Design a protein with these regions (language model features):
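Substrate-binding cleft/loops of secretory-pathway carbohydrate-active enzymes
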Residues: 1-34, 41-48, 109-112
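Aromatic-lined glycan-binding groove of carbohydrate-active enzymes
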Residues: 2, 30-70, 94
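Short secondary-structure boundary/capping segments
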Residues: 2-12, 71-72, 116-119, 200-203
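A generic structural signal for short, non-catalytic loop/turn and secondary-structure boundary residues
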Residues: 4-8, 46-50, 153, 166, ...
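Short, charge-rich amphipathic segments
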Residues: 6-28, 57-77, 123-137
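Short flexible/disordered coil segments
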Residues: 16-20, 50-64, 162-170, 214
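Carbohydrate-interacting/catalytic domains
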Residues: 33-36, 65-66, 75-100, 104-214
C-alpha cells in the first residue's frame, strides 16, 4: 500500500491467498487425482511478481474443522509425513516470504487450540522428530542460499525447467540470486518414486543433491 505520509496504510507485503488456496487444495487431493489438477500447482507463477507476497499458512488454516496441516495430507501415516515434507520444500523454494503457523513444523495432528500449548510430546516419536529436523535443515538451507530469497519480484530469480509433467505430478525449476547462482528444485507430488527421472538443467555441469525430503 502507499506510505502513511501520503494517506496509505504503510503495508509492504500482501498475503498470497491464491497460492495458499490452490496449494492446499492440490496437496489435499488423493495423488491419483492430482494429475488432473496440475494447474493448481503452477498457476501462482502467473502473478507471483505482481505484488510483494507472503506465502501464508496461518492459524486460520488449522482451526474450525479445517484440520492440521499434517492431517490435510492424504494417505496413511507415513504418506502424510512425506506429503508434509514435500509441501514444505515447495513452499520454501517458491517466490515469496514465508509464514508457517506453530506446530506445522513438527506435524501436529490436532487443530490449534488456543486454550492449551502445542503437543510437544509428539517429538518423542520418530516421524515428528525427523519432520522437525527436516524443517530446521530446510530453514538453514534457505538462509544460506540467497537464490531462494534475494530476487523475488521478477523472472530473473525464477525459471521453470518443466511445469507440465502432470502425468507424474512433478515440477522442476530453479531459483537464482543477483549474481546468477542457482538452486535447482524438483518436487514429486506423486505417491510413488520415479526411477531414473530425467530433468533439464540450465547449463552443463555436475550437480549434487543438497537437500532431500526423504
Amino acid at each position: 500500500t502507499r506510505p502513511p505520509e501520503i494517506g496509505g496504510l504503510g503495508f509492504n507485503f500482501k498475503w498470497n491467498m491464491g497460492w495458499m488456496n490452490d496449494t492446499l487444495f492440490y496437496t489435499s487431493l488423493d495423488p491419483y487425482f492430482r494429475s488432473y489438477n496440475h494447474d493448481k500447482l503452477t498457476f501462482s507463477m502467473m502473478y507471483a511478481f505482481s505484488e510483494n507476497f507472503v506465502l501464508p499458512i496461518s492459524h486460520d488454516e488449522v482451526v474450525h474443522g479445517k484440520g492440521s496441516l499434517l492431517n490435510k495430507m492424504p494417505g496413511d501415516y507415513n504418506q502424510k509425513f512425506a506429503g508434509l515434507r514435500t509441501f514444505m520444500g515447495y513452499m520454501m523454494t517458491h517466490p515469496g516470504k514465508k509464514l508457517l503457523f506453530m506446530g506445522c513444523e513438527f506435524g501436529q495432528f490436532i487443530e490449534w487450540d488456543y486454550h492449551k500449548q502445542l503437543d510437544w510430546m509428539l517429538l518423542d516419536y520418530e516421524s515428528h522428530r525427523k519432520t522437525k529436523d527436516y524443517i530446521r535443515a530446510l530453514n538453514h538451507y534457505y538462509l544460506a542460499h540467497p537464490a531462494l530469497w534475494q530476487v523475488e519480484d521478477n523472472w530473473d530469480g525464477f525459471r521453470w525447467l518443466n511445469a507440465d509433467d502432470n502425468t507424474r505430478s512433478v515440477i522442476t525449476y530453479y531459483r537464482a540470486d543477483e549474481k546468477g547462482k542457482k538452486s535447482l528444485v524438483l518436487c514429486n507430488f506423486a505417491a510413488s518414486r520415479w526411477e531414473d527421472y530425467r530433468m533439464g538443467v540450465p547449463e552443463a555441469g555436475t550437480y549434487r543433491v543438497a537437500l532431500c525430503s526423504e
